[in-house]
Each structure stands twice: as C-alpha cells, then as structure tokens.
C-alpha cells in the first residue's frame, strides 16, 4: 500500500514549505494521511487483515505525534494543516 511516485510528487507540491522541502513535518503528516486513507479502504474490504490493522494504528500514532509537535511549535500552521487535510482532531 505504498504511495506511488506521482502521488508523492503531488503531495510535495501541495504541502511543501519551500522549493527544496521534501521531509518537513507537514509533508510527513500529508504522506501518513494519504496512506491511512488507503489502508482504511483496504480494511473495509478485508476486515480480517489484522496485520494491516496493526500497521494502521501505528501510522495513526505516528501522525498524532507529528501533529502534536506542529501544534506546540505553531498553532496557526497546525490549524491550517488539519483544515487542508480534512482531519478532525
């Protein structure tokens, strides 16, 4: 369920902070959100796939940690990011 190269480039162009940004916290959250959405759809079709469910929970935890970090650093950036990604938190 990895992201394709074209999807990664699309996310980078949408969420990068500057021209050479490829790994900022915002981008990491965007990547994780996309993978979480893909995995959620997979689990709807395959409810007994417990290994994938565990991976999903790990990704959600990692995203939660990054969002907490962004929120502590800059509340405005945090609000903008969750609004753009459509995350309720």
From Swiss-Prot:
GO molecular function: rRNA binding; structural constituent of ribosome
Superkingdom of origin organism: Bacteria
One GO term (biological process): translation
Record-linked InterPro entries: Ribosomal_uS15, Ribosomal_uS15_bac-type, uS15_NS1_RNA-bd_sf
Positions of the UniProt region annotated as Disordered: 1-24
One annotated Gene Ontology cellular component of this protein: cytosolic small ribosomal subunit
Keyword Flavoprotein recorded: no
Nucleotide-binding is among the record's keywords: no
Keywords assigned by UniProt, alphabetized: Ribonucleoprotein, Ribosomal protein, RNA-binding, rRNA-binding
Family membership: Belongs to the universal ribosomal protein uS15 family.
UniProt-listed NCBIfam families: S15_bact
Record function comment: One of the primary rRNA binding proteins, it binds directly to 16S rRNA where it helps nucleate assembly of the platform of the 30S subunit by binding and bridging several RNA helices of the 16S rRNA.
Subunit and interaction comment: Part of the 30S ribosomal subunit. Forms a bridge to the 50S subunit in the 70S ribosome, contacting the 23S rRNA.
Name of the protein: Small ribosomal subunit protein uS15
